[in-house]
Each structure stands twice: as C-alpha cells, then as structure tokens.
Curated annotation (Swiss-Prot):
Residues 80-170 form the ARID domain. This is Lysine-specific demethylase 5B-B. The gene is kdm5bb. Residues 439-605 form the JmjC domain. It is found in: Nucleus. Residues 268-278 have a biased composition (Basic and acidic residues). Binds 1 Fe(2+) ion per subunit. One of its GO terms (biological process) is chromatin remodeling. Gene3D superfamilies: ARID DNA-binding domain, Cupin, Zinc/RING finger domain, C3HC4 (zinc finger). The keyword Repeat applies.
Length: 1503
C-alpha cells in the first residue's frame, strides 16, 4: 500500500433553479424578492429566463482586448499552497547551505514532507517519536502498509532533511549540519521551488485593460515564461503544451520555471552551482602584508592559519575553518555558502502576500478563444464539446489538490464594460440594435440597468463603481477559476453567461459565512497569519468536499449560456469555467440589504479594508430625497439613520471629552474616496473625521483617534459634514414619509408577534392585508409574511373545520390504505401545534385540541388492548373501539390492527363456540375445524392464534386419521372382528371432536354387542325362535359391518325357512294368486264384496305395474300375523287361529245367507248385482257352492267337466290348489326339523289339525246317518233324501221369485233378468245346519280330502219331488238335462245377441254419466276394468289374467310406471294407454272415447 491520494470529488447538492413566467420576469426585483426566502438558504440560485428572451450580444469584439491573469491551479488551493510554501522554505534553507533539496521516494511514491513534518510535530517532536518508537504508527497514518520497515526509512528521511530545519526554526546553533544530499539514493528527485516568494504582493499598478482595482492585486511582475525541459522547446513537447495556459515565447533559460508533467512524477535534476558566481568558496588570498593577516581569521578559533581551509561567507564575508565547524567539513562547498548568522537572517524574512500575476501577452477575444479551445482539446484529447462537465469538475479539483502536477491557465477577469462595451445593448452605444431587439434596452434584466433601477439603493451612490454599478466582463477558459469570496459590501450579485461553455458555481448561504471563514483559517492558518484579509483577495480556493466535511453547507450549479446566477448578501461563492465562455456581472442592493450594509462597514473597519463607497453618504443622499422615496425604503432609511445618528452622537461626544475643541464644516462628498480614507482602518469618511496640521491630507475616523499622529489631541480638528441638528430634521422627514407605513407595519408586527391569549383573530389579519392593498404598499418581506400568515390561517381554518365535521362514515372502513385526504395522527398533532403557533387565533383550535385528545385516548386504549393477549371476550370491546375510531376523520394506524385483532377474537370465539358442549353438543366437527383453520390462515400472525392453530391442526390431523381408520374398519371386506373395533374406539376416547365415522363405529359396536346378546339368548333359552325375530336379526346383522360368529348359523336357518316357505307356496298357491301363503293357510278373515274389491284392486295394480308382484297386506290379516308372531308358543298360536276359524265360519254363514237372499224371487231384480263384474244376472250363470253367489259363465271359468259332480268354487273362494293331506304333513315335518317358529308353520299345523278333526266329524256324520258311497245306485232311499228328511223341515231355492213375477220383471227389464245355472248345486232346502256347516268347512279347507268330495256328492243327489213350483223353478234355473256339448247354435247366437244388447244398453247408460264421472283416476279405472269386462272379452280364454295387463292397441308402446294414464272405450269398455291411442288427459276428461274397432263397427251398423 502506498500513500493515499486525494479522494475522488463528490459533487455537492444542486442549488435551486427558477424558471419564471413572462409575468414574473417583467419585474426582476419583485421576482428576486419572491424567491429570496428560498434562495438565500443556499446562497446562490440559478434563473432560466423564458425561452424567447434572447438578447443580442452587443460587445465590440474587434475592439475588445485584455491581459489575462495567470493561474497555477495547485497554488490556488489553500492547503496545497501551504504545502508548497513549506517545501519552498525547506528548499531555500538547504540552498543557503549550498545544498540542493532532493525529495526522496518511499514505496515508489514521492514522500509528502509536509505531512511527515506535521505528523511528527503532532506526536511531540523528533526526540519523543524516536524514544517511543512511533515511526510505524506515523507510516500507517500516512497510508503505508505495515510490516515493510517503512518507519525506519521515514525516520532517516526526517532526520536528514527536516530535523535540521526544525532545529534551526527552534533557534539551535546549526554550525554543523549534514547535507541533505548526502547518503541519498539516486532515485531521489531534486525539488525545484515554485518561486512563490518571488511572486508576492506586486505593487498596485493598474494595467491599461482594467479599471482601478477594488480588490487586492499583485505587487510585482516577473518574466512569466513557462519552462520546458532543458534542451527542448515548447513546440516539441505536446504533453507540456497542453498543460500551458498560453503560448508564451521562451525567454532566457535561466529565468524559466519548471512544470510537472501530468502522468509522471516530477522530473527534477540536481542544479549545478550558478556559473556566474565569481567568488569561490575557498578564499585564494595572495600573500598579504603582515598588517592584513589579522583580517582573515576564523571566527571560531581566532587563527588565520590554514588559509586553504578557510571558508568565506557569501553573505557577510566572515571566515570559518572547515575543521572548526561542528562537525568539520571534509570538502569546500561548491555552491554559495552562508554562515549561521546570514542563514538566520535570510530564513526569518517575513513572507509576503500571495497574488496573481498578469500574463505578458495581450489577447483579443478570438486569440484567447483559440488558445482556450486548443488547451482543452489537447488536455482531454477530444473535441471540446464532447468533454463531460462531470469529468472536467473532477479533474479540476484533482489538479488543485496535487503538488506533483503544475497546470497553468489564464483568466480574463474584471474587464471594464465601460471601455469596451457591455454584452447587453446600451442606449447610445456603438452597437446598432435591430428594431425587434429594442425591448432589451430598457429590460430590467439588462445588467446595465439593474444596478441603477429604483428598487436598488445603489442608485443613490453618486459615483460610478466599476464592478458594482457598472458591469464587469469575464472571459474564461477551461480550469480558470474564481476563488471563494463575498461581494463588496455584502451586496447581491447577478451573473449572466452570454455564450460559451458552462460555468460551474459553488455557494454557501450567508448565515454560514463565518463558519466557512473559520474552517479555512483552521485548515490553513499559515496563510491567514500573513494575510488576515486573504478571503477578500480572491486568490484562495478550498475543496467544497473539505468544507462540507467540516459542516459548511455547500451547493453547486452549472450555469449554461443564457442563464443567470444570483448570489445573495454575504454568501461565499466560487467556481471555475468548463471552457471558453463570456460572462457579465454586476452588483445590486435592495431594501432588505441595508442592515447588512451597515454591518459590513463595521466588519471592514475591523479588517482595515477599504470601502467601495460610503454607506453613510448613501443614506444621507436618500434622506435628502425623502419626498421621493418609496415608503418601504423610507422606513428602512429612517431605521438606519437612527442607528447612524446615535453612533455619530456618541463618537462626537467621546472626541469632545478627549479634548478636541476645533470643529469645521467639510464637504467630504467633494473629495474622491481614496482621498478621505481613514489612515488606520481605511474606512471612507463622510460624516466626520479628525485631522492634524502636522499631516495635511491625512485623516482618521472617530474610532481611531490615537492613530492620527503624536501631537496633542487638542491640536486636532473635527471635520464634519452635518451637524447633529442637521441630521435630525433629515431623519424626521424620512420618518414622516414612512410614518403611515410604519404605523401599519407596527400593527402588523404587533399582531404577528402576539403571544398566547393576546393573539388576534384572523379577521384582523385580513383587514391589515386589505389595508395594504388599498394603500398600495410595496411588496416586501412584512407584507409577504402577512399575506402568507393570512393564507395559512384560512387554510388551517378550513382544514380544521373539515376535521371537526369529518364524520363521513358510520361504519369503520375495511381497507387498510390511508386515504389521500386523510391526516395521520402525527400530522394532526403537528397541525394542532401549527394552529397554536399561528400568529392569529382560530376558533377551531380548542375544539381540534379536544378532538386530538380524544384520538390520543383512543390510541392509548387501542395500544393497551393490542398489547394484551387475543381474547374471545374482547370482541365487543374491539367493536366499540372500531366504532369510535371510525368517527375520526384521521388515519389511525390502530384501526387496521384492531380489525385484525377483531378477526382474531372472532375466530377464537368461533373456536370456543365450536368446542362448547352446550352450544355444540355434537362436538367440533372436521368441517368446522377445516373451516376454522382456513380462516385462521388468513389472520395476522399472533402467538395466541398460532397456538390455537397448532392445536386445531393437531386435532384435525388426529381426527382425520381416526376417521380414516374408522371408515376403513367400517368398509372392510370381510368385516373386522368386534375386538378390533373396540381397540379402535379406545383411541377415540378423549378426542374432543365430532367424528361421524367413529360415532358410527361406536354405534356399530353397540349394535353388534346387542345383536350378540340377542343371538346368545336365542341359543341359550332352549325355546324355538320365531322366524320374524330370526329374520330380523339376520337383516340387522347384515347392516352391522362386524364379523359376527353366530350369523352363519342364523343365516342357514333363515335360508332353510325361506326354502320351506317357497316349497309351501308352490304347494298351495295358485299361479298368479292374489293371496299370500299365510292368507291361504289361515282361516278366512274377510268375505264377500270387500275381499272382491281388494282382489280386483290387486289385480288392477298388477296390470298397471306390468306384472310386478305386489302383495298387499290386509290390516286384519296383519293383525293375525302379528298375533301369531307375538305368540310365545304354539298353544297360543292355535288359540288365535281357532278364534279366526270361528270368525270365518260366522262370516261365511252371513255371506251365504246374503247371497241366497238376493237371489230369491222377492228381490229387486233390477238392482241385483252379481258376479265379479257386479252386473245383473243374465243368461248362463254359475253358483259358488261356498259363498252361494252367482257368476256369469262368461266372467269366470266354469267346471272343467259339467257332468262330473264336483263342487264349483268361485275365484274368490278358490284360494289354493288344495294339496292332499299327506303332502301337507311332509311339509310340517320338514318344518319341525328346522326348529324355527313362523306364522305359516303354525297356520299349517292348525290346518292339519282342523282337517283331521273335520275328517273325523264327517266320518261320524256319515256313519251316524248310515250313509255309504255304495248306496247311490237308485235302489231304495238315497242318502240325500235321508239327509234332507232328517232335518224336519224343507228349504226351497228360489231365484228371483215365481215364474210369473220373473216374467213381469223380464218384460219390464226387456228380458234382461232371464238367467239360469249351468251346473248342479247343492239344494239348501231341507239341509240340516250340521251338514251345511260340515260342507262349508270342508269347502273352506285348503286341503284336498276325499271326504269333501264324498260329502258333496251325497248332498248333491237329493230325492226327486213332484212340487210344481219347484219343478218350474228347476226348469227356470236349470237348463234341459242334456249333454254338455248339446248346446245348440241358437243358444250361442242368443248369447251373442244378448251381449250386443248389453253393449247397446251400456252405451246408452254411460251417455247419461257426467264428464267428471267418466274420467276417473288410475286406481278407480283399474277397478272398473276388473268389474266391467265385456262378455266378448271374457268369452276368450279366462285361464290367464295376464291379458288385463296388456293394452289392446295394435301398436302398444308398453309404457311403465305408476303414473301411466289409461282411457276406457265407452263402447267395448276396454282400457287403452292414452299415449298409445293419442288421447290427452284433457280430451279424455271432456269427451267420450271410442276405440278404433268400436268406431268402425258403429259406422257399419249405421250403414
């Protein structure tokens, strides 16, 4: 690591840039006053005129010529100049010793001797550093890497070069010094002095190109040739050429000044002793006379011997032996040698002030531009317009901070515009202005006009001040700079860049002026020791980064062509030019400057700096014109005059007391400024001064009375311009002029400065503002402040009222973002403070303060609640807080947090409610947990929420796992054992959740346990189980997803019972029988019409359901079945069936009597309804032997063999196939092996017992009557005759009365009552009740017994009788005794004719029905179909009832379902599907329907 170089420059922040409108641009002073509050905070600002404002360049370019100043960049910077001065002193010190200073290299870099010397001094000096071995620390401080023994090298260099100089400065005798060139490496470079001491404080000789200087000039000039390397001309060194500020012709080589090349270290060669020195260091004296020997003696030893070793001082000619010096010199020095006394004299000479030197060449504007452009393009090796401003800025500050590179430039500064013309057009000037540019002549932004405009107080300065009231011109080149300075008299300045490359500015605000001065004095005290007013000389610059590092606020800007830069009072500013350009500047002073102007004069007096004009003279001139002054200016003048008169009165009183008695009126305004300066402080005298006759033309101000001369003060004369009596009227005149304004201003000031309860209402401020407008008071700070305060107060009042009335909502918002129009609480707090800080009082302020207190209370309550744990009980409290917070029209950051907390609390409430056993007895369900977790995920994280979420998640995971396991167990195939399920339930215990599958599993286990207990009770009890219970257990077992061990055995028993029932059903039931097996086996419960209706309804239902079997359980039969199932044993079941038997016989008796009675001749034959069709009897009829009802032969199937004497039973009475008894007994025995009780088994057992009992009784009856099947051969009395006779009375079967009555009825009924029976029936007349009961019970039995047929045949063959009526009746009821196939074709035709007549009668009868009666429901129509089958339909095969399920339509669509609609043909009474015949429900309800067949037949009959 090597020594640290200067840090890269960091540009300061930009200053304000203003772009006024045309309206604002019209009045420059009004605009400057407007921007002053902003711009004075940065010291400088930039103003861009409107784009169309482009004044012509009016300067006479051909006549303009100037001599620029030479600027060596590294001499400008204060700290760099200090280093150079130090090196020059070291070089001079060794040069006087006859030695040449060579700067050593360390780590391949030139050693910074200044820094090394300063660090050693700061550490306590050479001896202390050596004693405490601090050289390594110093090396590290200088930026060298540790561990390379750099410290020892630094010590050697310090001891050899700097230590002797420091000893000399401390006053130690240096008679013997080691030469700095001894024991040095060849790589050490010789130091060439910068000749700063030779270029100090040149006498003020005004050149012909500038006005009398008002800033420090250089005191002398020298041949300013720029030196190139020896033996080479400037023309042959391009690198050197681009570092030169001008092309100066080389003069004498001995006067050349070395220049450092940029890329390389200094090429310094050891200088040879000057050849022109004729006096040798060794004094070769010819043998003198004896009397002259004593003249050349050594001042140390006092002897004159060893003349060849005697040295003669080149300064004082004193002699010293080389061996007398300590330590002795081995050789005679080759160069000049000074003795210690002369060395002290030379080195102790005071350092003269630094100043710029003038170049030796006079430039025209063209020539300077060529030189400037050539320099910049050569330096950056690119065209001038392509060099970035940032690069130039960084390179400039690098160059001013280095001592290794010497770059010289030239700057045409302070060129008087009065001689060569301004860049702006002037009236009467040589530049001819175009007509369209004449507006620029009177423009306020024309710098020739600005300083002398009415708002500028400089108009009252009588003399023309070049640079202040008259513009100065500036011609710059790249790197040419203007150093840190403030304007004369701390005035404003304005600079306009007419054309060229930008000018970079740096500025510090006026309040930081003293801070900047203190920093510069601190960092470069050596410069200020010799030049206290250094900053007034414009010769010193300092890096802005350095100033900013010490707390000085610095701002920058780049001024481009056509832009103004304004500097404000006492604002330090500096800068440099980016390239060739032309600028113009002037000063001006406004009313607000006047207090600063007087302070500046006092400041100048302390620094002994001359004034550019007399401030007191300017004030008095304005006071003399009081009637013409602006009221604001008059007020300012009055205040300034008051201070001035007070000060002058005190000074004159002081002088009078000191003894000055002579007074004399003196017209100081007739003298030039340089002729009336104080000889001490150089202040321009005006009001008064002291003179003495001993020094004519010399005066002092009243502050420096003792500095005039040594004469007694009584000899002094007080010269005065005005008496005090003259000054007071002048001040009063100004006061009267400003009195009204002052009164207004005082009132404004009073209300503006009122405190607390003394503040006035805003209406007072409005009144004052209106008054200023009425009186046309000029724009000034006070008026602007009043206007600003009034505007602020009105705005604050409006905002405060809005906040007070700002309840813009009744419910709190859901959004979290801040409304653009809402204030934050801190902003509202600041706003309230602003209200109370306003100079005026607002009625809304206390109300808003109260509102703010409420808001703060709300915030405190909210913060306390938010700091607590999330609680479900806090929902109502949070809601009330949110409701309260929503009333404030302020952005409250607690509101979104409260909303989040509310959601959290509600969520916790939901969790607690879900877990509450009272509110939710079932427990927390999985869906509730998932829903709560989903809601919880969207909540703002909180420890309470996180804990509850973790608990819910854990519970959900466990619950889901248990549910899955429970579901797997419930769906397991084959099912799991009960033990597995119970072990699973032990895991569920203690889980606070509603688990449906687990509950189902629990229910399954409970049901399984109950089932096993029931199964165990069935097996252990010893009694035969009931089939219903057994079947129910099997069904329940199938619904229990558990492996049940007894189930297999029960299923086998149930299967056996089902097989038995199927066998029994096949044995008993007729095909398509409407009766169940139990109904067949049990005694009959219902008889007659009710059973008939139910049977027909059942048959119709079978038709509608397309043949699907549906066994309708009768209520009474259900009771029987329930009683049988509930019976505990067979005995109780037999008792129940015995009761049903008695009911059966009783019902049959009633039914038979009813049916017999309606067939008696006395009956109303017109209303007689018989058969399954419930129509009148007609034609061939069949009479059931059991129920004794009559049936049309066409409606039911008759006996298969009419000649075979077999009892015919109607379809309602024929309930089963009546299997033989042996077959039934086998069924019963097979059932007993199964050991299961079922109602069918009990009924079968009872049937068998009943059948056996009946057989026994029949046999007893037959035996008791002596009947035998072999006595029926016709010999003797027939068994039936004996049976009939034994009854003791006779009964005659008469159907429908006597023949005569039947004939009448037949006639009246149009022969519809003519009917007869086709088979022989048992005559009931004379039949004993016992035999009838036996016969009825035998027919009721569903068992085929030979006794039944035997008894029937015996009862059927009764004795012949000669009774006429009976014979007639028999002839009427019974057809002729012929064979079965003896039915003639006539009888068949008669039957068909009768059928057709019935159809006609039915058609006529149905036409009388209402339309509502014609359209019946599906169930009613099914009954009508079963009861209204026509003879033609029933004449077909009645063997199958399945025909009733078919639609007669040719293309039947075969629809299915309970909702299929039917329609009946009104002719043939056949039923059709509505969809098959294309009839809608509405059409069928309103119109008669006739099928296609009937329609065709009907039309044929009509034909």
């Amino acid at each position: 690591m090597t020594q640290q170089g200067p840090a890269e420059f960091t540009p300061p922040p930009e200053c304000p840039v203003f772009e006024p409108s045309w309206e604002e641009f019209k009045d420059p002073f009004a605009f400057i006053n407007k921007i002053r509050p902003i711009a004075e905070k940065t010291g400088i600002c930039k103003v861009r005129p409107p784009p169309d404002w482009q004044p012509p360049f009016a300067c006479d370019v051909d006549r303009l010529h100037f001599t620029p100043r030479i600027q060596r960049l590294n001499e400008l910077e204060a700290q760099t100049r200090v280093k150079l001065n130090f090196l020059d002193q070291i070089a001079k010190f060794w040069d006087l010793q006859g030695c040449t200073l060579k700067i050593p290299h360390v780590e391949r870099k030139i050693l910074d001797l200044y820094q090394l010397n300063k660090l050693v001094a700061d550490e306590g000096g050479f001896d202390l550093v050596c004693r405490e071995r601090r050289w390594t620390k110093i090396a590290m401080t200088m930026g060298f890497a540790p561990g390379k023994a750099v410290g020892s090298h630094l010590r050697a260099h310090y001891e050899r070069i700097l230590y002797p100089y420091n000893l000399f400065q401390s006053g130690t005798n240096l008679l013997c010094l080691q030469k700095p060139g001894d024991e040095v490496n060849d790589i050490d470079k010789e130091y060439k002095p910068h000749d700063l001491l030779q270029r100090q404080n040149v006498p003020l000789q005004p050149s012909n190109t500038s006005a009398p200087a008002r800033r420090a000039k250089r005191m002398k000039t020298e041949s300013g040739c720029i030196k190139s390397e020896e033996g080479e001309g400037v023309e042959n060194k391009p690198n050197l050429r681009r570092r030169m500020g001008s092309f100066v012709v080389k003069t004498e080589p001995k006067k050349e000044i070395p220049i450092q090349v940029k890329e390389e270290p200094v090429e310094i060669k050891e200088l040879n002793p000057e050849p022109e020195k004729s006096k040798p260091k060794k004094k070769n004296i010819p043998p003198p006379p004896v009397s002259m020997v004593d003249l050349y003696v050594c001042l140390v030893c006092g002897k004159g011997n060893d003349e060849d070793r005697l040295l003669l001082c080149d300064g004082c000619d004193d002699s010293y032996h080389t061996f007398c010096l300590i330590p002795p010199l081995t050789d005679v020095p080759k160069g000049d040698w000074r003795c210690p006394k002369c060395l002290t004299q030379e080195c102790c000479k005071p350092q003269e002030a630094f100043g710029f030197e003038q170049a030796h060449r006079d430039y025209t504007l063209k020539a300077f531009g060529e030189m400037a452009d050539s320099f910049k393009s050569d330096y950056f090796n690119m065209p001038v317009h392509m060099v970035p401003t940032e690069l130039v800025e960084k390179e400039f500050w690098r160059l001013v901070g280095t001592i290794q590179e010497d770059v010289t430039v030239e700057y045409g500064a302070d060129i008087a515009s009065k001689e060569f013309g301004s860049g702006f057009p002037i009236k009467g000037g040589r530049f001819k202005i175009a007509p369209h540019d004449e507006k620029y002549l009177q423009c306020g932004w024309n710098l020739n006009n600005m300083a002398m405009m009415t708002p500028s107080v400089l108009t009252h300065v009588t003399a023309d001040i070049c640079g202040m009231t008259l513009p100065w011109l500036y011609v710059g080149m790249c790197f040419s700079s203007f150093c840190w300075h403030i304007e004369d008299h701390w005035s404003y300045s304005i600079n306009y860049l007419h054309w060229g490359e930008p000018k970079t500015w740096y500025g510090a605000p006026g309040f930081a002026a003293e801070q900047l001065e203190a920093v510069m004095k601190k960092l470069a005290p050596e410069l200020f020791d010799s030049q206290p007013d250094l900053l007034h000389q414009l010769v010193t610059i300092m890096n802005p980064n350095t100033l900013m590092a010490h707390g000085v606020p610095i701002y920058r800007t780049n001024q481009c062509a056509g832009e103004f830069v304004i500097t404000f009072p006492r604002s330090y500013h500096s800068g440099f030019n980016q390239g060739f350009n032309f600028a113009e500047a002037v000063n001006f002073c406004t009313v607000d400057w006047m207090p600063l102007g007087r302070q500046c004069v006092d400041h100048y007096r302390q620094l002994h700096r001359y004034c550019v004009f007399s401030h007191d003279e300017m004030v008095c001139n304005m006071a003399m014109k009081a009637d013409c002054l602006d009221v604001v200016l008059a007020s300012a003048v009055q205040k300034d005059m008051q201070l001035m008169i007070k000060e002058e009165r005190e000074l004159r009183e002081k002088v009078r007391k000191m003894g000055v008695a002579q007074c004399e009126l003196f017209q100081y305004d007739l003298l030039a400024d340089d002729e009336r300066q104080c000889v001490k402080c150089r202040t321009t005298c005006y009001l008064s001064a002291l003179t003495c006759p001993c020094r004519p033309g010399v005066q002092v101000c009243l502050y420096h009375t003792h500095d005039l001369c040594s004469c007694p003060i009584s000899n002094y004369t007080l010269n005065y311009r005005f008496t005090l009596d003259d000054l007071y009227p002048m001040m009063n005149a100004v006061r009267q002029r400003a009195e009204y304004y002052d009164d207004w201003a005082s009132r404004v000031t009073e209300v503006m400065e009122a405190k607390l309860d003394k503040k006035r209402n805003v209406t007072v401020f409005r009144t004052l503002l209106e008054e200023s407008n009425e009186q046309s008071f000029p724009e000034n700070d006070l008026l602007r402040q009043l206007r600003l305060v009034t505007q602020d107060a009105e705005k604050c009042s409006s905002v405060a009222q809005q906040l007070l009335n700002g309840k813009r909502q009744t419910r709190y918002r859901t959004g979290k973002a801040k409304s653009p129009n809402q204030l934050t609480v801190e902003e509202m707090r600041s706003f309230v403070r602003q209200l109370y800080n306003l100079p005026c009082s607002l009625t809304q302020a206390p109300l808003l303060k109260e509102l703010l207190n409420s808001i703060e209370d709300f915030q405190q309550h909210s913060e306390k609640l938010l700091s607590d744990e999330v609680s479900a009980d806090a929902v109502s409290e949070i809601e009330s807080l949110l409701e309260e917070g929503s009333q404030f029209d302020v952005f409250l950051p607690e509101l979104p947090l409260l909303r989040e907390r509310l959601e959290q609390a509600r969520w916790l409430t939901g969790v607690h409610q879900a877990e509450d056993p009272v509110a939710n007895p079932c427990g927390l369900s999985l869906e509730s947990m998932r829903r709560l977790i989903d809601r919880g995920v969207g909540l703002t994280p909180h420890p309470s929420i996180e804990r509850m979420m973790a608990r819910l998640q854990e519970l959900l995971t466990v619950s889901e796992e248990l549910e899955e396991n429970a579901q797997a167990l419930l769906k397991a195939r084959p099912p799991e054992s009960l033990e597995t399920l119970c072990s699973m339930l032990t895991q569920v215990e203690g889980v606070p959740a509603y688990l449906p599958n687990c509950l189902l599993l629990q229910d399954t286990v409970n049901r399984a346990k109950e089932w096993l207990q029931e199964a165990e009770s069935l097996q252990v009890g010893g009694q035969v189980p009931v089939f219903s219970s057994l079947s129910d257990m099997v069904l329940r077992a199938h619904s229990i997803p558990v492996r049940l061990e007894p189930l297999d055995q029960l299923e086998v028993q149930v299967s056996e019972v089902q097989s038995w029932k199927e066998t029994a059903a096949k044995t008993f039931l007729i095909k398509s029988s409407p009766f169940t097996l139990l109904e067949v086996l049990c005694p009959r419960w219902e008889m007659g019409s009710s059973l008939k209706k139910k049977k027909m309804r059942k048959m119709k239902g079978d038709c509608v359901s397309s043949g699907k079997k549906k066994f309708v359980k009768l209520d009474s039969m259900s009771d029987v079945e329930r009683a049988l199932s509930d019976s505990k044993d067979s005995a109780s079941a037999m008792f129940t069936l015995a009761e049903v038997r008695l009911k059966e016989l009783e019902s049959l008796c009633s039914l038979r009597a009813s049916n017999e009675s309606k067939l008696l001749p006395t009956a109303d034959c017109a209303s007689l309804k018989v058969c399954v069709c419930q129509k009148p009897a007609m034609g061939a009829m069949l009479q059931c032997e059991l129920c004794r009802d009559a049936f049309h032969s066409v409606c039911v199937r008759g006996p298969s063999d009419p000649l075979d004497p077999e009892a015919w039973l109607c379809p309602l009475c024929l309930r089963s196939t009546k299997p033989p008894l042996d077959k039934i007994r086998s069924l019963l025995s097979s059932l007993q092996r199964i050991r299961v009780r079922l109602p069918e088994g009990d009924a079968l057992r009872y049937m068998i017992e009943r059948s056996v009992s009946w057989q026994r009784r029949v046999r007893e009856v037959i035996d008791s009557y002596g009947l035998s099947s072999t006595s029926q051969d016709g010999r003797g009395a027939s068994p039936s005759q004996n049976l009939y006779r034994s009854t003791g009375h006779s009964r005659k079967l008469q159907l429908c009365g006597s023949p005569s009555r039947c004939q009448d009825w037949a006639v009246s009924g149009q022969e519809q009552t003519v009917f007869y029976t086709e088979q022989r029936c048992i005559p009931l007349q004379g039949l004993s009740p016992e035999l009838e009961e036996l016969m009825v019970e035998g027919l009721v039995l569903q068992v085929s017994l030979p006794e039944t047929q035997q008894l029937y045949r015996l009862l059927l063959s009764g004795p012949p009788t000669t009774n006429t009526s009976h014979a007639e009746h028999k002839s009427y009821l019974t057809p002729p005794q012929t064979e079965t196939d003896a039915i003639t074709s006539a009888e068949k035709k008669a039957k068909r004719r009768m059928n057709r007549d019935e159809v006609d009668i039915r058609e006529r009868g149905t036409k009388l029905k209402s339309k509502k009666q014609r359209m019946m429901g599906v169930e009613k129509r099914r009954e009508r179909k079963a009861a209204s089958v026509s003879a033609s339909d029933m004449s077909q095969s009645e063997d199958s009832e399945e025909d009733m399920t078919l639609c007669p339509a040719e293309s039947c669509l075969q629809p299915e379902g309970e909702e299929v609609d039917w329609v009946q043909c009104d002719c043939c009474n056949r039923w059709f599907h509505m969809i098959c015949v294309g009839v809608s429900a509405e059409l069928a309800a309103e119109e008669d329907y006739m099928c296609v067949s009937c329609s065709t037949s009907h039309m044929d009959r009509r034909k």
